[in-house]
Amino acid sequence: MSYRVTGDAARKARERYELKQAAAEFYRKRNVPERLEEALNSTFCLGPEDVYGHLANYFAQFSMPPTICQIRGRKVLDGSGEPTVEVEVSCTVKNSDKRICSSVISAVSEHPKASEGLEQERNHSADTAIQWLKDLSPLLKGMSPNEQHNIDQLLSDFYQPKIEEEKARRQMEREASPMAIEPVPSPVTSPALGKKKGSGKGKKAVVMEKPIPPKEAPEPVVPGSPAIGALSLAVAKASSVLGKTPLYLHIATLRNEKLPSEFIMPTPMISVLSCGKSSPGKLNLMKEVLVIPPTGLTVQQSLDMALMLQNQIVKQINSISKTGPAIKNVTPLGCMLIGGDRIEQPLDLICEACQHVGLELGRNLYLAINCAAHELMDYNKAKYEALSGTFKSPDEMVDLYVDLINRQPAILALLDPLRKEDAAQWESLTKALGSKCFLFADAASKPVCKLLESADIHNPPCSGTVIKHTNETTVSQLLGSFKLIEGENRVTILGCPCEESVDDSIADLAVGLGARFVKLGGLLRGERSSKYNRLLAIEDELTQAGTLGFWTKHEFPILSDVENLPGPEEVE
């Protein structure tokens, strides 16, 4: 019996010894004794009030880097009340699973907003996006949020079969249903003023007008695609949160090999009026009238100036109203919707407002016009309807813009003055006005992914392209598009779509990417003003850090791909 007791005791002693040895080896491999000794010595020397807090901070630097543990998606509403998807990223941090951040981006449809079935389409896209996120969650599990480019490549690889499936599905639908053949507009004929040679007396000559290029088919939007862009942004935000650095600094480190010593805030293009197709008057040409501050102003000064001008415009509209204060109709772009019967009517209104508040157009502020020409084309007449009942050919539109800029030199930029298909007229317009104002392509430009695939930013020939973070666009693709545009001596603009979400990350993206301009809309909607507020916060941080810089001039780029283009001009 005593032998058995002795044997059990020896076995237990041996097990305890082996356990102690295993524990010692476990900690030795991880250098715990040395680091513990160092931590205790430094804590004693420093004598911090919060001893455990100091020890926690010391050991935190040796913890394993956070890794993604879960991706979740939920359906939310954007600023216009339309369904979209929010992406939430959770990470394993110091052995605990924690929710880190979320992001929402705009879901842009390939169909007009008024099209039937849009609500069902948006709901289907959001539901599909949520399912995609469930599929992506195990693929990203264990990856570090710092692996932005690797994760974006994984997302692009995941998305590519989806777009091929969507193309195949659409092809099958076309083959299964009768083809709807759109009538091709025939060349429009117009009577000449002179008599036709060799014809009977009094007969007028008939002039054949050039047919316009047909409308290009819109790029297919794959249901669920917002999951890709939103997840890419959420990963970038997670990396910045875990690294305890603002998102704009994180984006800047992705863009540059080293952090720049100075940050220049993008110049805001602020929408104040809308006189487009949806406005009550005859004028269709000005979907947005925007103000652009001169260089040298802070974002705060620019917004104060725009707000003062906007309030004065409201006073003027109320003063001429016969029924009391006019109802302030606000578009989804965040600006006032007014009617106009003449092309210069909204410009005259702004000019009068500037005089009342002591601003000089062309010196204290400039104007920009979003023409949205693709919305003005009447394909039956093969002409643009700049004013209701007034139709102009693409060549006549070029003459209209040249005359307008000559009479209104304070106009610094035109956005989408023509359809992207009217390449010859874009070239003519660039030759005529390229040294006087910026000509930007918004809807006339390619989506970011197609822009990178083709590496062609010369069609249409323009001063710059409005880049938007929507649908399947990843952060890496945004970085690539900015590099491409700047490499071709073009101006970079980061913009919001018409239906915008409440996420204010676009402000950080604009600063981190080094955008020359940022187009966020007007000041009259919450989802727009929140982005301006984020710009103000970033500007304040840069001011406190002493790293805020300023643009010195508005300089129009030299477009080498347009022959005989005049040299660049500069304005303050």
From Swiss-Prot:
SMART domains for this protein: Enolase_C (SM01192), Enolase_N (SM01193)
Active site, UniProt feature: 468 (proton acceptor)
One Pfam family, short name: Enolase_C
Its EC number(s): 4.2.1.11
Database matches in SUPFAM superfamilies: Enolase C-terminal domain-like (SSF51604), Enolase N-terminal domain-like (SSF54826)
Residues that, per the record, bind substrate: 288, 519
UniProt entry tagged with the keyword Cell division: no
Annotated metabolic or biological route of this protein: Carbohydrate degradation; glycolysis; pyruvate from D-glyceraldehyde 3-phosphate: step 4/5
Region described as Disordered: 181-204
Composition bias, Basic residues: 194-204
Gene Ontology MF: a single term: magnesium ion binding
Superkingdom of source: Eukaryota
Record key words, sorted: Glycolysis, Lyase
First-tier enzyme category under EC: lyase
Reactions accelerated catalytically: (2R)-2-phosphoglycerate = phosphoenolpyruvate + H2O
InterPro entries assigned: DD_ENO4, Enolase, Enolase-like_C_sf, Enolase-like_N, Enolase_C, Enolase_N
One GO CC annotation: phosphopyruvate hydratase complex
Similarity comment text for this entry: Belongs to the enolase family.
PANTHER family the record matches: ENOLASE, ENOLASE 4
UniProt name for this protein: Enolase 4
Native source organism of the sequence: Xenopus laevis
Gene for this chain: eno4
